[in-house]
Amino acid sequence: MSTRQRGFTLLELLVAMFIAAMMFAIGYGAINQAMKNQDALKEQQDRMKEILTCMRMMEQDFVQLEPRPIRQPIGDGYLPALLGQSDPTAQPIVQLSRGGWNNPTGVQRPGLQRVAYYFEKNTLRREYYTVMDPVQQSTTVKRDLLTKVKSVTFRYMDVARVWQTQWPPTSVAGAMAQLSTLRIRPIAVEVTLDTEDWGKLVRIFEVAG
């Protein structure tokens, strides 16, 4: 007894097309979501790298803080080895003399480096001079360290283990003309970065020596 082959009915075709469309939509949505997740993950990884790089550079600066005052660009006075402003609107907020400036190519320049930190337009920026005693015409090498920053606060621990909001402390500010006073270093530096996405990040750097 023979049987006849029959084709799909219109209803069956519509159901099959609907199922195929649904599977395509689900597959596309999954791929699209995976791509979004991948982009978000990369963004988070880039942000983490930015934060870690910022912290590492600040650590290298403060750990290698040297007691080396510099001449003022104008006049005969000197600036302290470390000058930290208590006014958060003052620029630069911190400037310091540091050692350990690597010179792999053997360029004729000092092994010490004068570094300054600026906070402008929600960005923490690091600048350094190529000479230790800059003049007005001296230029700096600039690098944005961290973006999306709401505020930056520095504190400095003195030998009595008391935190100061400026450096040199107000107790020695009247003796700023003495070169020995300008060499005074804290035993530790605390930085607080209030960021838009990670909240407050606090690090304490112990000053060597």
Predicted regions: what they are:
Residues 1-31:
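N-terminal single-pass transmembrane signal-anchor helix
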Residues 27-135:
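Extracytoplasmic beta-strand-rich oligomerization domains located immediately C-terminal to a leader/signal peptide
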Residues 68-71, 144-156:
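Structured surface patches comprising rigid loops and adjacent beta-strands/short helices at the edges
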Residues 88, 107-111, 141-146, 181-185:
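A generic structural micro-feature
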Residues 106, 134-143, 165:
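A short, polar/proline- and glycine-enriched secondary-structure boundary/capping micro-motif
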Residues 112-114, 140-142, 199-202:
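Short, mixed charged/polar active-site loops
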Residues 124-127, 132, 142-144, 150, ...:
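Periplasmic/lumenal scaffold domains of single-pass inner-membrane subunits
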Residues 151-209:
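Short linear sequence signals and composition-biased patches located at protein termini or domain-edge surfaces
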